């Protein structure tokens, strides 16, 4: 067995849709699978392995579904979420409390079982939300390296109108420090995450996923 071979897991949501993130994930996962054991753990149940040439690749797939039952856990998490967002100060202690409700305990158990069952060397969270899932269970994962791969800009997450993570800067900062690494797509974003949230990030630019053909019209 090749001693340099690694078992790598990408934890992602929509894998088989039409989008930039899906395309980039496919390019990188397929390239890595030439020399490593690569699996994508997806919440996407609309499986279509013909997308992006997955069916002809060595990339493996696992799936996970979170059942959102309106049980006692659901309402307890709702209460904690309300308190954190509307009443409590935002600090390290309250961020830890909010982590309980952001990703429900029953969901955490599911994800821990999936990840630890695969005996992976590295796990990569695709997108901020799924990276936060991994951060909340980092101490319980038997994995050497857990990394966040953030595809949204700092402004899109926190500053623009209708940001993806409104009012969650403190929570994001505290949770992400649990991870072994954070990857962003630009040096400017790396600076913003460092200066505003105290998070050290590495910059890895997305690969070219479309091959340009011909010359662009001067009209554009």
For each predicted feature, which ranges?
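N-terminal strand-loop element at the rim of the active site
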Residues: 12-18, 35-97, 189-192
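A short beta-strand/loop micro-motif in the catalytic core of glycosyltransferases
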Residues: 123-124, 177-187
């Amino acid at each position: 067995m090749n001693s340099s071979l690694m078992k790598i897991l990408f934890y992602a949501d929509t894998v088989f849709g039409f989008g930039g993130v899906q395309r980039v994930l496919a390019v990188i996962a397929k390239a890595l699978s030439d020399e490593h054991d690569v699996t994508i753990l997806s919440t996407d149940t609309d499986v279509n392995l013909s997308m992006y040439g997955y069916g002809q690749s060595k990339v493996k797939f696992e799936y996970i579904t979170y059942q959102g039952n309106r049980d006692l856990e659901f309402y307890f998490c709702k209460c904690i979420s309300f308190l954190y967002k509307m009443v409590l100060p935002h600090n390290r202690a309250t961020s830890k409390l909010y982590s309980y409700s952001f990703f429900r305990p029953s969901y955490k158990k599911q994800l821990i079982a999936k990840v630890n069952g695969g005996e992976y060397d590295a796990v990569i969270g695709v997108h901020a939300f799924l990276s936060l899932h991994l951060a909340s269970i980092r101490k319980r994962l038997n994995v050497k390296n857990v990394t966040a791969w953030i595809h949204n800009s700092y402004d899109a997450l926190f500053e623009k109108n209708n940001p993806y993570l409104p009012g969650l800067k403190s929570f994001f900062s505290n949770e992400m420090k649990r991870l072994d690494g954070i990857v962003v797509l630009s040096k400017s974003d790396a600076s913003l995450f460092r200066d505003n949230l105290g998070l050290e990030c590495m910059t890895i630019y997305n690969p070219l996923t479309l091959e340009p053909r011909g010359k662009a019209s001067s009209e554009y």
